[in-house]
Amino acid sequence: GSTSECFWKYCV
């Protein structure tokens, strides 16, 4: 993906 948002153990 182009985004680098990580939450807990999930990166989107």
From Swiss-Prot:
The keyword Disulfide bond applies. GO terms for biological process: blood vessel diameter maintenance; regulation of blood pressure. GO terms for molecular function: hormone activity. GO terms for cellular component: extracellular region. InterPro entries: Urotensin_II. The keyword Disulfide bond applies. Keywords: Disulfide bond, Hormone, Secreted. Transmembrane segments: none annotated. Its main location: secreted. Belongs to the urotensin-2 family. Has a suggested role in osmoregulation and as a corticotropin-releasing factor. Probably involved in smooth muscle stimulation. This is Urotensin-2. It comes from Polyodon spathula.
